[in-house]
Amino acid sequence: MVTKYTSPVNAYRLFKLLPILFLIIWVADSGDYQTKVYTRAILAGLCFSIVGDFLLLFPTQFKSGLFSFLTGHIWYMVAFISCDWSVPILPTIIIIILAMGMISQLYSTSGKLKIPVLVYITVIAGMGITAFGRLEAIQSTPAIIGAMGATLFMISDCILGWNKFKKPFHLAEGIILLTYYSGQWMIAFSTMK
């Protein structure tokens, strides 16, 4: 009975969820979520992220986890466009080129997940563009931190996609977790004044 709850697999699952849980609690406690759409949308994105993290712990739930993260990215986009916003020309061009590159590399190797992967890459690119649009309009420290967080999240997802659908590589898991948690922390921190 004790082994069931203290096995390395269950410990890994617990520790994988804790950082995002702490961010949810921190933003709910510290952020101005009652009056600011931005903070409420980031909080919603974090909640969908922790659900996605949980689902991705089970290989059979990859599509559900992908959908949960996709929903989280949409909430982040809502947050980024809820403030002043401007079209960020150069970041948009760069992100679109990178997204098209990822689609061209992963589309043929993603099997039955071709359409979900295509939609997911499109949405995460949109999340990055909206984060830089907020930065373009506001040019504040929280906007810089939010754009940096979105960039790290995009990097994390690109490495995850490459590792899963194209070619697994040795350090992928560590790099994915480092960029993912750093990105989420920065996005959460962007709610602070």
State the predicted function of each range.
Residues M1-K193:
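Polytopic alpha-helical membrane-helix bundles and their juxtamembrane interface segments
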